[in-house]
């Protein structure tokens, strides 16, 4: 809800300008990434954002999947339902919501069918709530059943989905860090304390197992990207950053060196927030080379500690090496203590 296809993204400079204005004018405005009306869960969107880095590869995958599934149904070209747009929507839906445990079970299939039916009716092209087109909708649901039984499809889908999920986690952690440290009051929607891969509402209104979340938080003593699947890393970071309560002025920090466009950083009083962008690009070329992040003058001479990892971060010539800041995670939140 509230999205605009014409607003695909913003530059880092525009992001800093918006936050500077918010800190001055609307410091208590709500910052939210999921609501009861969200059309895709926040971590599903973080996965799909990876696709914008690899458009050619994504397009090739879509063509491959369509060819496999249409051939399996005895179809040549896009002649039978779903049409091209609805089929494309389905692949996005499947990729964004694909369960971490990888179970394509009956419950998940039912959720997919419900989401596709609602999307088709609200698009008002082939069907509507007032006048449902049962024939078209039935053909789409049959298509989903065929997907669930296609070994050829999953042989190409699963490796790609696993990669997008892994890279999407990095986007999720950046999104979470920005939400909890940028100016404004962060809003955490029920259930999104762990990975939120929900589909169109009301899929995002399913019961939440809070006992499981309490147990995870009690068990989590440190965070690592090596064990991201259970979502404990997101829950742990949420707790840490809420305790921090970054407030006060907003000071943009502009990185220096070869990969400046991959870093969004700012300071909130005695806190430095560093985030690494574009996970697919960084995976293809992981070397940070000479990229460094300047330390604001008021933090010089302080011991800087990453509250997420507990590690001390070294300053050299009033700068922090990006390779050190992002050694373990795509985010670092540094707190300064006087020496």
In which residue ranges do the predicted regions lie?
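Carbohydrate-interacting/catalytic domains
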Residues: 1-339
């Amino acid at each position: 809800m509230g999205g605009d296809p014409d607003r695909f993204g913003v530059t880092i400079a525009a992001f800093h300008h918006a936050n500077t204005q918010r800190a001055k004018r609307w410091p208590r405005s709500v910052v939210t990434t999921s609501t009861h009306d969200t059309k895709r869960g926040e971590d599903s969107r973080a996965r799909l954002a990876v696709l914008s880095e690899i458009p050619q590869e994504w397009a090739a995958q879509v063509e491959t999947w369509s060819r496999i599934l249409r051939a399996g149904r005895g179809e040549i070209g896009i002649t039978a339902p779903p049409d091209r747009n609805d089929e494309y929507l389905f692949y996005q839906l499947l990729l964004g919501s694909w369960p971490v445990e990888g179970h394509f079970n009956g419950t998940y299939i039912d959720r997919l069918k419900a989401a596709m039916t609602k999307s088709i009716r609200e698009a008002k092209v082939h069907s509507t709530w007032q006048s449902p087109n049962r024939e078209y909708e039935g053909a789409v649901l049959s298509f989903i059943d065929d997907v669930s039984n296609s070994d050829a499809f999953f042989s190409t889908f699963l490796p790609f989905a696993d990669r997008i999920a892994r890279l999407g986690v990095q986007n999720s952690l950046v999104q979470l860090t920005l939400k909890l440290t940028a100016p404004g009051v962060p809003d955490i929607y029920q259930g999104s304390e762990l990975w939120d891969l929900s589909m169109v509402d009301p899929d995002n209104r399913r019961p939440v197992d809070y006992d499981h979340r309490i147990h995870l938080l009690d068990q989590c003593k440190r965070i690592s990207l090596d064990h991201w699947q259970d979502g404990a890393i997101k829950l742990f970071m949420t707790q840490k950053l809420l305790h921090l309560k970054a407030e006060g002025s907003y000071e943009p920090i502009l990185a220096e060196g070869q990969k400046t466009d991959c870093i969004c950083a700012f300071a909130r009083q005695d806190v430095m927030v560093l985030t690494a962008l574009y996970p697919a690009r960084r995976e293809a070329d992981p070397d940070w080379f000479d990229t460094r992040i300047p330390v604001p003058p008021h933090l010089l001479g302080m011991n800087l500690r990453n509250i997420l990892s507990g590690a001390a971060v070294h300053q050299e010539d009033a700068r922090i090496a990006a390779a050190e800041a992002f050694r373990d995670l795509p985010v670092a939140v540094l707190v300064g203590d006087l020496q």
